[in-house]
């Protein structure tokens, strides 16, 4: 187990704590430094005092302001260990604006192409829309760091080649904290890319594709430089994009684009120009001249000069609170501090297990926490239940907020990283964003039990080991010592304390009715009702459920135990008819109305579970259709006509075996971990009501429940037989379903629960017909 070694001395830590006393005053633990770090109290005080002491006005008016801005410009270069001889500093609104500036002004030439890494911030993806020049390619991280060429010389100057290709990647992944080795910068500048990546778009002919162009590197350093040193003498990307609030917490609204001398040679001013970027522009003629100074050509309009001046106190505060030592610089010390906290947290999380041995969390990282040059101060994970199913990150956000812990959940504007770490293929992404309707920034956290994002914890220089321990204690107390319903009740009781977005998430914590399945013909396939559909209830169960059955020539009910092909008969309930389908071309219909059917129909008697049932024969035509398709002579279709009561409590029943409804928890099905699609496994259990809860098999503890306000009594668990071994899509048998349930239930064959509707307490002569709707909230008593 990792022991934590503090980077800061006791006196240094005491001074830092004093600067952030507002955290203790607000009983807050702040763990989203990858979103923004926090500003020190003396930092904003000093910035305000500077504004009070000086007359700082438009830099076009006041030389003092210009001097301040130049001072900041030189301080930025010093911070990254470079000089104005090697890099220009262009002020922007933020890192996103810097990326946009590169996309707008980079000269691709006639054959240059744009390459970007899959695990990039959304802003890098946005560059694609500005660079539709020749070709756009997506690289996976291993195609950048794994496809290196041996460096064989110095970085060449701009050559006579016809194209310039641009590769953009993040120095540190803001999802996981993984750092791409920066040695690849020089190697790619010299030798180009070994592989171009996946082609997304191209206007080039085959002969011009992937030509040996000159390669330039745009480094998205926003996440990296917040807690890590970037030495631009050692690594020389052509463009560096960053936001200062990530480093200092204050001010916001100012970032920078650093452009190397090499990068400047292929940086062409776009058509637009603003105030301050030109020597002159005639209104009467299409004539203008750009400024000679490189950075002035690209800083359109008045700079955010007050914010820029405020950066000086950011640099001073950082250097004062985390002073350089003989061995390490300020940023190296911060990097060591946040990495140590991340390593400690990751190790502690790995130690957390449920009583049955299941790990509490699923961690997402590439190289572990052994080397701070490859991993930053970020830990990404999802929480799992005792059965192995995932807890939605929205619930974690709610629980954390109620414990005063501020962290981040979702995909963090990095869908590519989400896709990689969660193992989502392209179809899964479509299922999340196009079919299920998730959008960036929402709390739509689980689809079919699989996470759509993660929980991210990230550290800054003011984060303490006590902060990390409070997070660990929250996870232990909430997810190792309590049950899902207890957590939900806790969140609901405290919901008014949550911010608005999380209040909306509280409404999603309760399980909901996902699907209803009506089986009009006993032992045949289901007619399914899904979101947002509703269905009426009768005093026997779901309307039309198990109202028909097929009998053999001896009048005995035919089930899948004798004829698995029954599952291939698919019913469709229409306005006035029940249509039966077998295969693609064979269909037949019978009337839904008993009045239409009863006129010329013979009455018959059969048995269900040893109980006699009365039925109406549906005629020769459908009988012949059944016999031909199932390959059995003498089959008849009967419809229940008389009342049938259970032997136990006289509840009214259709042709079901035991109770009015069979409820299934999709989370329990998921725990079986079969290789077949989840919906196919759900179909095996032939349930009427399908819900999805926070943990598997919790339905076995229910005594009563309500769905959309309709009350149900739990009759008990469903004891399973080998019927569940039949694949309801194909009719094929496979024994592993039964053996897996037996193993999970320690020899018992229970899966799903029987429930019965509690009659309405009403004195109306004709009570209103009740409906259930997919999406109805399930409340457990």
Curated annotation (Swiss-Prot):
The lineage of its organism: Eukaryota, Metazoa, Ecdysozoa, Arthropoda, Hexapoda. One of its GO terms (biological process) is molybdopterin cofactor biosynthetic process. Sulfurates the molybdenum cofactor. Sulfation of molybdenum is essential for xanthine dehydrogenase (XDH) and aldehyde oxidase (ADO) enzymes in which molybdenum cofactor is liganded by 1 oxygen and 1 sulfur atom in active form. It holds the Pfam family MOSC. Gene3D superfamilies: Aspartate Aminotransferase, domain 1, Type I PLP-dependent aspartate aminotransferase-like (Major domain). It is an enzyme of class 2 (transferase). The active site is at residue 413. Belongs to the class-V pyridoxal-phosphate-dependent aminotransferase family. MOCOS subfamily. The modification Phosphoserine is found at residue 734. This is Molybdenum cofactor sulfurase. The keyword Ion transport does not apply. The modification N6-(pyridoxal phosphate)lysine is found at residue 246.
